[in-house]
Amino acid sequence: HFPDTWATQWFGVGKMIHSLFLINCSGDIFLEKHWKSVVSQSVCDYFFEAQEKAADVENVPPVISTPHHYLISIYRDKLFFVSVIQTEVPPLFVIEFLHRVADTFQDYFGECSEAAIKDNVVIVYELLEEMLDNGFPLATESNILKELIKPPTILRSVVNSITGSSNVGD
C-alpha cells in the first residue's frame, strides 16, 4: 500500500518518464538517465531550438511537443532538468517531480550545481534510481531517501573511492 501522494496518483494514470537530461547554460548535456529505453540525445534538439527562440532562459516553454515525445523541463540554479515523456502526462506532476529532484540534490550536496552533481555522480544515479521506479515517481521524500542512500561525507567519499563501494544503506 502506497501513501496517498501526488506520486502515487501517477500509478493510476499509467504514464512514465522515459529519460532525464541535465543541461548547463552552455547547452552541454552533462548527465542523462534512462528508465525504460534509451532516448537519443538528439531529442534535446527540440529543446535547444525553443531555447534559442526564448528571450532568456526563464522564457523557455516548460512543455515542448515533438513528433514522438513531450519534453517537460524546469530551470533551477543555472541548470535545465529536461524530462522525456512518450505519452500525455499532466505536466504539473512532472514539473513537481523535477523540482523534487533539484531539491534532493540541494539537500544532499549543499547545492544543486553542475560541479556538485559531477562530484557526486554515483549518488546522483542512486537517487534517481530510488526516486523513479521504471519511470514512475516512487521515493521522493528526503527523509526516506536518506534511509536508503546515505548522504555524502568527506570520510565516506574517501572510503568509497578506496574500497569502490557505494552509498546504498544496509
Regions found by a protein language model. Give the residues of each.
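Intrinsic-disorder-associated, low-complexity terminal segments enriched in Asp/Asn/His/Tyr and depleted
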Residues: H1-D4
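Acidic, low-complexity cytosolic segments
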Residues: W6, W10-D170
